[in-house]
């Protein structure tokens, strides 16, 4: 898990980083543009002079519009100024396929470096590096037990005396069934 450098909360992953300003200066030209659009009034060149493409595209009102209304607004703007949306091509952040770590708490973000591992899961169950000590499991009476087994240890006492036969059933980290002989503490994975 990767944490924010500023507030130490965990990062989320997004492809959509927007510099939405909370409070502060109000863009009157933007309010006029959306007001005229909502009232079906004619948009003129002077309505667009103090606006940037990102002002329109990243505005919450534009984002909440239906696709039909977005296309309608964009075509109305293009009918007044054909080069208004051509600025988008020069904006690197708008047309990229970048992903970002973003903190939902403090709004800090940073691009995800190429080659960064986001999530991994190992499904390899052939790994025989057994680091768990199963000998203590024989003392846990909450685990299931069976007498129907043959111990893998050739020198185990259960091969001579069937009354000593008892094995504890447990699961390993790969969710495989592990038998532990209570007589000799030998453990093995059941192969059916």
From Swiss-Prot:
Lineage: Viruses, Varidnaviria, Bamfordvirae, Nucleocytoviricota, Megaviricetes
Keywords: Virion
Chief place where the protein resides: virion
Localization of this protein: Virion
Record GO cellular component, one term: virion component
Protein name, UniProt field: Uncharacterized protein L208
């Amino acid at each position: 898990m990767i944490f924010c450098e500023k507030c130490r909360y965990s990062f989320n992953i997004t492809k959509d980083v927007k510099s939405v300003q909370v409070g502060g200066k109000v863009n009157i030209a933007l309010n006029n543009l959306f007001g005229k659009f909502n009232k079906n009034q004619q948009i003129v060149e002077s309505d667009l002079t103090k606006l940037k493409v990102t002002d329109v595209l990243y505005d919450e009102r534009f984002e909440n519009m239906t696709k039909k209304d977005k296309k309608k607004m964009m075509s109305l703007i293009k009918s007044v100024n054909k080069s208004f949306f051509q600025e988008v091509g020069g904006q690197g952040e708008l047309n990229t396929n970048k992903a970002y770590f973003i903190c939902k708490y403090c709004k800090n973000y940073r691009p995800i470096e190429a080659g960064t591992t986001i999530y991994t899961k190992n499904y390899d169950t052939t790994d025989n590096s057994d680091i768990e000590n199963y000998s203590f499991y024989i003392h846990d009476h909450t685990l299931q037990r069976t007498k129907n087994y043959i111990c893998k240890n050739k020198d185990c006492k259960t091969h001579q005396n069937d009354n000593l036969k008892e094995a504890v059933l447990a699961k390993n980290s790969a969710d495989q069934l592990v038998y532990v002989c209570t007589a000799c503490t030998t453990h093995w994975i059941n192969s059916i």
